[in-house]
A protein has these predicted regions:
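Active-site acidic/histidine proton-transfer and metal-coordination neighborhood
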Residues: 73-153
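N-terminal pre-domain/capping segments
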Residues: 1-95, 99, 127
Length: 153
């Protein structure tokens, strides 16, 4: 049986983020996902989920400076500590919200590094995230985005 989740980062955008939970429930969704919960109080998110009888199905690891065009930092050499801090934050939110899936946007290919450095950084960061999430029984997802929709990804 198919199960659909409303992506509250993409749907109902004419409403304030917290109002989108109500709109998703009224539209018949039983699950919701959102890209980045980190600017929201965990207790407020828990209440919105509970009040609307919604399951939180997925959120992303922090992805760097989104406004500046970053789309993940997992592949960027020198940002490993920031990536690890993001894994910890993602776990904290997932635990509190009952989520068992976390998505990693690996990032755009950075300039100034060799392909080997970028590859090795990505592999090490994904390995770290997978191991930390596995300890919490959380599945790490990797979103395959193409170069047409997101150049440089």
């Amino acid at each position: 049986m198919l199960r659909f989740s409303a992506n509250l980062s993409m749907l109902f955008t004419e409403y304030d983020f917290l109002e989108r939970f109500d709109k998703a429930a009224l539209s018949g969704f039983r699950g919701v996902e959102f890209m980045f919960p980190y600017d929201n109080d965990i207790e407020v998110l828990k209440r919105k989920l509970r009040d609307n009888n919604l399951e939180h199905t997925l959120h992303n690891l922090p992805a760097g400076d989104w406004a500046a065009g970053e789309r993940g930092i997992a592949c960027i050499p020198g940002r490993e500590e920031e990536f690890r801090d993001g894994v910890a934050a993602a776990i904290r939110y997932a635990r509190a919200l009952g989520n068992k899936k976390i998505n990693c946007l690996v990032g755009k290919t950075p300039s100034g590094f060799s392909a080997t450095e970028i590859h090795d950084t990505l592999v090490e960061n994904l390995r770290y995230a997978a191991n930390m999430l596995a300890k919490e029984d959380i599945l790490l997802l990797i979103e395959p985005i193409n170069h047409f929709d997101m150049p440089g990804f």
